């Protein structure tokens, strides 16, 4: 979830502008259950609030038939400066603070691995803990803390690993301050990307494809990059996703989503999108 305000509420204006031949109605829910129920029942066409593990768990527990129609954005973990402001300055015995809850710790460790600081055991993946560290060439000390406490030890550890929300609360900008962050082709980004969810069988419908195409358009990507300064990153399906360039994002001009218009229905149909707000 991007913020306490709804995702599609913030994206509604640029999205509606690009849909042109269809109208988009956004309804905000204040829980994580009802948005899936109304899509399952057919009352709404789609929702946009959840990542794939939650969607899969919901289907298993509730017997629903919801599927991922397209990944739109993810909120990256980043390595931020503590007492050192460059990963090139890493020395033997340096300490790195990470969140200690299961999911967040695994993402932090994977990010450290992606940057050559540690190596995890094969298959550890998103269940990794410090016990899964197979190689630690710099003998770094992994300091495990409650997630909200990690940003408070920047004066005590060489680096800290934070998720987007806590980075923002600590005054960090992903685009300007992160020494490294999760890329679209990372295991974590592919798993925790926020998706458009629809009832099985509707994922290839013309209006759902029009919605997904618009939300993945250059215009919406530019909007997200400008609005969130790296705290939220458009998800790229390709494995060679480009790194975010906040300077380019600041200068980006709005682009027309002509491809989405080509796929939109000829009649002015309505896409009802259920969405959760934190």
Residue map of PLM features:
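Pocket-flanking alpha-helical
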Residues: 32-63, 85, 168-171
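Short helix-initiation/N-cap motifs at beta->coil->alpha
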Residues: 26-37, 125-152
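Short, polar/charged alpha-helical segment
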Residues: 1-25, 34, 38
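A conserved helix-loop-strand patch within extracytoplasmic ligand-binding domains
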Residues: 69-118, 221
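A bilobed periplasmic-binding-protein/Venus flytrap-type ligand-binding module shared by bacterial periplasmic
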Residues: 76-87, 192-205
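Ligand-binding "clamshell"
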Residues: 57-69, 84, 156, 161, ...
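Periplasmic-binding protein-like
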Residues: 106-113, 215-235
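Alpha-to-beta junction loops
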Residues: 40-50, 94, 117, 138-141, ...
């Amino acid at each position: 979830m991007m913020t306490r305000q709804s995702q599609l509420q913030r994206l509604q204006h640029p999205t509606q502008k690009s849909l042109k031949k269809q109208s988009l109605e956004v309804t905000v829910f204040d829980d994580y259950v009802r948005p899936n129920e109304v899509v399952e029942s057919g009352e709404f066409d789609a929702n946009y609030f959840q990542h794939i593990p939650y969607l899969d768990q919901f289907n298993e527990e509730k017997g629903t038939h919801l599927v991922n129609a397209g990944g739109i954005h993810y909120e990256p973990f980043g390595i931020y400066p503590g007492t050192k402001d460059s990963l090139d300055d890493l020395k033997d015995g340096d300490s790195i603070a990470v969140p200690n809850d299961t999911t967040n710790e695994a993402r932090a460790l994977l990010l450290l691995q992606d940057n050559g600081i540690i190596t995890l055991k094969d298959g550890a993946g998103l269940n990794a803990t410090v016990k899964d560290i197979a190689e630690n060439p710099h003998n770094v000390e992994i300091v495990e803390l409650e997630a909200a406490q990690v940003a408070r030890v920047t004066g005590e550890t060489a680096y800290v690993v934070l998720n987007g929300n806590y980075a923002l609360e600590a005054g960090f900008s992903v685009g300007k301050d992160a020494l490294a962050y999760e890329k679209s082709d990372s295991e974590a980004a592919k798993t925790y990307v926020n998706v458009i969810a629809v009832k099985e069988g509707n994922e290839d419908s013309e209006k759902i494809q029009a919605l997904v195409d618009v939300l993945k358009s250059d215009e919406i990507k530019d909007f997200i990059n400008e609005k969130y300064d790296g705290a939220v990153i458009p998800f790229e399906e390709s494995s060679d996703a480009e790194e975010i360039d906040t300077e380019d994002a600041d200068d980006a001009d709005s682009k027309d989503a002509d491809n989405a218009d080509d796929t939109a229905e000829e009649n002015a149909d309505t896409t009802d999108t259920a969405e959760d707000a934190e």
